[in-house]
Amino acid sequence: MSLTSALPSADMPRSMVWLFATASGLSVANVYYAQPLLDALANDFGISHAAVGGVVTATQIGCALALLLVVPLGDKVDRRRLMAVQLIALVVALVSVSMAQSSSALLIGMLATGMLGTAMTQGLIAYAASAASAHEQGRVVGAAQGGVFTGLLLARVFAGGISD
């Protein structure tokens, strides 16, 4: 048997690879939008400029909680269903952040956004790896991870443009 006959005949379509990369980038971007907006958030919520760093702290605590508690669920339950639930929860968290009237509501929303944005990102990368055939996993995971880096950087640029 030749090596070529052992390989699957259909590669993951480029559009699917781009979808994983884009979704990963958009998911992680939610975790980083607030950083350039801290001065505006301090003014809008009447928080001191020293205390507004709690927004980033809450988001990063959410990231850590996701890695410890939520991401491992992808090995135990159906990954597609888990990601669908996480997506709905992330949308709810983002809506709660956008409608926050108090600093405590903002912090809780950012904690949830950090947790769900991180969990979605990691889940998408793992799902991309499992959906790709063995010979293209590196390319697919690399594209998804590239989407993460691009989303992280562009989120800060976009939010920085809004804050100016």
Which sequence ranges carry the predicted segments?
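Extracytoplasmic
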Residues: T22-H49, L67
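Interfacial helix-cap and linker-helix signal at transmembrane-aqueous boundaries
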Residues: L41-A42, L73-G74, F158-D164
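Conserved MFS/SLC helix-loop-helix module at the cytosolic interface between two early adjacent transmembrane helices
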Residues: L65-Q101
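Paired small-residue
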Residues: A93, S104-A112
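Helix-loop-helix hairpin linking two adjacent transmembrane segments in secondary transporters
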Residues: S103-A105, A143-D164
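Residue-level signature of mid-helix packing/kink "hotspots" within the transmembrane helices
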Residues: Y32, Q60-L68, L152-L153
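Cytoplasmic helix-loop-helix junction between adjacent transmembrane helices
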Residues: G109-G147
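Small-residue-rich transmembrane alpha-helices and their cytosolic helix-loop interfaces
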Residues: S24, V56, Q60, L87, ...
